[in-house]
């Protein structure tokens, strides 16, 4: 599965998050892998005759989407399912996760 793409995104996010004392590279790698799987499902490559190489090339078009979804999911650890969070005067409101997939369109098979 798109290991090169996965590694690139993990490297970038590691640079961004690496100074955080709670940073966990293993969990981040899982979040990136899951984000790639989700984009693959949303694209519905099964409806095409795309080869693995073509799929991987197409996934690079969604690099920023995959990265954003992985980062979103990583940052949601401990607050899963919440749309907002208030604690000690700090207020956070999460965007709807589905918004991150805007622009990812599925292939359809015409019968």
Predicted ranges, named:
Residues 1-58, 97-111:
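Conserved short "hinge" loops at termini or chain/domain junctions
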Residues 54-111:
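Short loop/turn elements at secondary-structure junctions
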């Amino acid at each position: 599965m798109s290991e090169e793409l996965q590694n690139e995104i993990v490297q970038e996010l590691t640079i961004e998050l690496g100074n955080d004392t709670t940073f966990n590279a293993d969990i981040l790698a899982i979040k990136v892998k899951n984000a790639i799987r989700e984009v693959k499902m949303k694209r519905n490559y099964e409806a095409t005759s795309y080869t693995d190489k073509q799929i991987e090339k197409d996934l690079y078009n969604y690099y920023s989407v995959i990265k954003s979804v992985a980062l979103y999911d990583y940052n949601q650890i401990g607050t899963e399912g919440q749309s907002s969070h208030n604690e000690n005067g700090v207020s956070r409101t999460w965007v709807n996760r589905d918004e991150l997939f805007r622009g990812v369109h599925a292939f359809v098979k015409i019968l």
